[in-house]
Amino acid sequence: MKMKNVSRLLAMFLLLNAVCLIAFAQKPAKWTAPDKYKTMKNPNAADVSTGKDLFAKHCKSCHGKDGLGDGPKAATLGVSCGDFTSKEFQSQTDGEIFYKMTTGRDKMPAFGKTITEDNDRWAIVSYLRKLK
């Protein structure tokens, strides 16, 4: 009788482990912006200086001073912070970047709540374009 209980317990443990491995091994869903943002144009494209200052204040701790995703907080998050110099990132429209910065997701804060002026978030988008 004891051996039967041990076998059941072991089987349940192995099943639970398999479920956890599958759940954590999956890549996060692709982060897409709604269509209306994909065509948005940056009304503040020339304001790179303000964007640089705001990036240093709000983004650098995770994304690093050069936008490589290697800021001091990045290692503690358990997820990639992304590389703003990458072709993949730079291929997004300004509106897509603006949307993601504004709404956030998972460990990425929703900066629409802390950087409340749209023009300031657009200025950060302008600065991010210079990181190519």
Predicted ranges, named:
Residues K2-L14:
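Bacterial N-terminal signal peptides that target proteins for export
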Residues L16-F24:
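C-terminal segment of classical bacterial N-terminal signal peptides
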Residues K27-L54:
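Electrostatic cytochrome c docking/interface patches
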Residues K41, V48, K52, G64, ...:
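Gly/Gly-Pro-rich "capping" loops immediately C-terminal to redox-active cysteine motifs
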Residues G51, F55-K65, I124-L128:
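The canonical Cys-X-X-Cys-His
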Residues H58, H63-D66, E88, G104-R105, ...:
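Conserved functional loop/turn residues at catalytic and ligand-binding sites
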Residues A75-G82, E96, K100-L131:
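Axial heme c-ligation environment in periplasmic c-type cytochrome domains
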